[in-house]
Amino acid sequence: MPLVTTKDMFAKAYEGGYAIGAFNVNNMETIQGIVEAGKKQQAPLILQVSKGARNYANPLYLKKLVEAAVEDSGLPIALHLDHGDSYELCKSAIDDGFTSVMIDASSLPFADNIKVTSEVVKYAHDHGVVVEAELGKLAGVEDEVNVSDENACYTDPGQVEEFVSKTGVDSLAIAIGTSHGAYKFKGEPKLRFDILEEVSKRLPKFPIVLHGASSVIPEYVDIINQYGGTMPGAK
């Protein structure tokens, strides 16, 4: 079984009414642990690699490790670039054989976010790769992504339809109050489920991604599943 795209996964998740966990990896031991858990649950997996992990471990090594995980487990596994901060980085990941990439241009003005995301989408789709983008900014420190609580902002549901339509993106990460990296365990997250609900109404059956899920309580994960969300790292 080859690596799969997240697009295939999300379609099946909607049919089955479940979310999919995405887990950051940077070495063999981490990949083995995640895959063993996946085998026990017979769950599809998104194994994602950050910019820092690519610099640390070499994307070729990581790709071969993930391919070995597919061969060993027989599970549907996607290899995803997490928080790609430029067209060049996303292009490099696509050329390296990643089946999914995230372009995070959420720090840019809305129009510029659309422009950069559209460029990535064109190159990715030409190569059979799917794209995740982000609207709104999550608080947190992860690799070179650093957004303070003061600069974090919720996603504006009024922008999501235009953004998806103009970019052709395959999934959308939104900000509803989760945080990632060094901020993720600083108190119980105050999640704006009203934003999640409104986005799901405006984008019916469209894959929604929530980052920073490690500290989200199980009851909240159940609610997020109801709205078709995927939660990287969800417990």
Predicted segments, located by residue:
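Conserved residues at beta->alpha junctions
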Residues: 24-25, 212
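Alpha/beta enzyme core
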Residues: 4-12, 27-53, 60-76, 84-207, ...
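Short acidic/histidine-rich active-site segments
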Residues: 212-215, 234-235
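Terminal accessory/targeting
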Residues: 5, 14-22
